[in-house]
Regions:
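Catalytic core of PPM/PP2C metal-dependent serine/threonine phosphatase domains
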Residues: 89, 166-203
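Fold-independent oxyanion-binding glycine-rich loops
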Residues: 10, 93-96, 121, 196, ...
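Short acidic (Asp/Glu) patches
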Residues: 31-33, 68-84, 88, 92-114, ...
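A conserved acidic, glycine/proline-rich C-terminal tail/linker
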Residues: 207-238
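Extreme N-terminus nucleophile/cap motif
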Residues: 1-70, 201, 236-238, 244-259
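Cytosolic regulatory regions built on CNB/CRP/Popeye-like sensor folds
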Residues: 59-62, 68-69, 126-138
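Conserved beta-strand-loop-short alpha-helix elements that form
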Residues: 2, 116-126
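Long, charge-dense
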Residues: 135-161
Length: 259
């Protein structure tokens, strides 16, 4: 299992979202409140991806990623980077590796390509045999160049394949969740995706909360604090969030409910 978050809004330091909140990802790495399906800590690596600030009118820069196989609380270099780095969008995660899967930096989220950043909180049941069918839709080169031999890396490859084909981001996540659930029933499939302007996420087997106001959107496995405005996402729902807009839709439906 893992914990993850994504933010889009006014530029803030990474530290203010990841390290400093009373229940930020740093605390969730060693004292999570709502781990489901096994695991007690998230100490098998972590990562963060952020979108560098660019001058007004300039095209947006692709995100920068920092990934490690160490627990977040042991990495003084990341703490320094997070305190000195300001971004208007980011995705970060802490990892609890499924038994038998490698603990390496390349196995830690976020995964990415171009403008996209992606994370998975959960597990694919019966890995790897159960998902041979969905994996067969990928080009062989995609399978040979997975970031790591893990379920999360394969899920990213499946989502990325749909995005490359022109799928709308929410539809790409929905299609992958439903295909993998059919092939591997009982999987836990909380997926998180951003392009730096909006956030898409699924709640499928694990907790997920959102906080959206006119200025910012924040999606997190667990609320970062006890402040007002947090909303728990119902099980088996798709989230589309951007500043000033939150949409929820059942993952078996294509009709969103705008909040």
């Amino acid at each position: 299992m893992c914990r993850h978050l994504a933010y889009v809004g006014p530029p803030v330091t990474m530290s203010s979202l990841v390290l400093e909140p009373p229940h930020g990802l740093l605390r969730q790495s060693y004292a999570p409140r709502d781990m489901r399906g096994g695991g007690t800590v998230n100490a098998d690596g972590f990562g963060a991806g952020w979108y560098p600030a660019v001058p007004v009118g300039s095209p947006g820069a692709d995100p920068v990623r920092y990934r490690s196989a160490s627990p977040m609380w042991t990495d003084a270099a990341f703490a320094a980077v997070a305190g000195a780095t300001t971004a208007g969008a980011l995705l970060a995660a802490v990892r609890s590796a499924t038994v038998g899967m490698p603990v390496t930096a390349s196995a830690s989220a976020p995964f990415g390509e171009g403008r996209w950043l992606f994370s998975h909180n959960g597990v694919v049941r019966g890995w790897p045999a159960a998902v041979a069918g969905p994996a067969a839709e990928l080009p062989v080169t995609d399978l040979l160049t997975l970031d790591a031999p893990t379920d999360s890396a394969l899920l990213w490859a499946l989502v990325r394949h749909r995005l490359r084909a022109g799928a709308e981001p929410g539809a790409a996540l929905t299609g992958v969740v439903l295909a993998v659930e059919q092939a591997a029933p009982g999987s836990r499939l909380n997926l998180l995706l951003t392009d730096g302007a909006a956030i898409w996420a699924t709640a499928w087997g694990h907790a997920l909360s959102v906080r959206v106001d006119a200025a910012a959107a924040l999606v997190s496995s667990e609320p970062l604090d006890d402040g007002i405005g947090w909303e728990e996402v119902p099980h088996r729902h798709l989230v589309t969030a951007r500043p000033g807009q939150l949409r929820l839709a059942p993952l078996t439906s294509t009709t969103p409910q705008t909040r």
